[in-house]
Design a protein with these regions (language model features):
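Short, acidic/small-residue loops that bind anionic groups at enzyme active sites
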Residues: 1-11, 30-32
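Long, compositionally biased stretches enriched for glycine and/or charged residues
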Residues: 14, 20-300
């Protein structure tokens, strides 16, 4: 009975693609359905014309120079070697966080990450990259506290007066004030994305107004993307959920064994026990003890 809508701003990667190849993002018509952090640019039009040929021509003529110019700095994940490689593998551009998700072969070590995500540090998911992200978030958090508690500081001076592209407030505005708009949302599937069960959360476009959040039914994703990207993520989610609901400790172990970072069964058991031995942080300290919830099967 709880009304829930998940949001992610990764879909704005289509604007990064457009700007990079010299197109005005405001002239783009697009669609990128899938699962959270696993969405694919099925529709990419510029002023009514298919923009994929423009992207192909730009990649052919410019991508190597684009990467070379940024080898000592940062390459946006959206236009990284990983993203372009996935485009070549699947025939559709991965959007937003999808290039970061990729396959295990993009993430085996730091040098591999530098190959696929470029720049001086190999993207934002390396130790140095994460430190940058966390530092930025901490700085913004401190700004928010100052704006909230310091009467001498005006939020508008810190954050500006221009409307951002984030969807939270416009969606609320649509639901409450009937200012209709189309948004990218994560909701129960209920037939919106073909091939996925109704009770699984999918990321699709939706019309939002006083009547609620109404997902649009999208075209099926290519079968290869479904088999190699969508279904594996869906099944991993189902295994994780079943482990939580059943309390089966062996299912947690399987999740570690299934990782390409795992090198042996014994290593997997050591990792599991180390994770379960960690002190819980807030608010997990107030829920059920994880070691009481998860048990080995009775015949273990």
């Amino acid at each position: 009975s709880i009304k829930v809508c998940g949001l992610c701003h990764g879909h704005y990667g289509y604007r990064n693609i457009a700007r990079t190849i010299g197109l005005d993002p405001d002239g783009i018509t697009w669609q990128a359905p899938g699962l959270n952090h696993n969405i694919w640019l099925t529709h990419f039009y510029y002023e009514g014309q298919d923009a994929y040929p423009l992207l192909d021509a730009w990649i052919k003529d410019n991508i190597e120079a684009y990467w070379e110019d940024r080898k000592s700095g940062d390459i946006p994940a959206q236009m990284s070697p990983s993203a372009i490689h996935q485009y070549k593998m699947y025939g559709l551009m991965p959007v937003g966080d999808t290039p970061r998700r990729g396959g295990w072969w993009y993430h085996t070590d730091l040098e591999t990450r530098k190959r696929w995500y470029g720049g001086a540090i190999g993207g934002g998911d390396t130790p140095e990259g994460r430190d940058r992200v966390l530092k930025s978030k901490e700085e913004r958090f401190q700004q928010m506290k100052e704006a909230a508690y310091d009467s001498e500081i005006r939020p508008i001076d810190l954050f500006g007066d221009r409307k951002t592209t984030e969807q939270h407030i416009p969606i609320m505005d649509g639901l409450v004030n009937d200012n209709e708009g189309q948004f990218q949302v994560n909701v129960r599937n209920d037939g919106a994305l073909p091939g996925i069960p109704d009770d699984v959360a999918v990321e699709v476009p939706a019309i939002v107004n006083k009547k609620g959040i109404q997902p649009l039914r999208v075209y099926p994703l290519p079968r290869k993307i479904m088999l190699e990207c969508i279904y594996p993520d869906w099944l991993q989610m189902e295994r994780t959920l079943e482990a939580l609901k059943s309390g089966d400790k062996s299912m947690l172990l399987y999740g570690i064994l299934d990782s390409h970072q795992t090198r042996s069964y014994d290593q997997a058991t050591e990792v599991l026990e180390a994770l379960l031995a960690m002190e819980p942080n807030e608010p997990m300290a107030y829920v059920e003890d994880i070691n009481k919830h998860y048990k080995w099967p009775s015949n273990w």
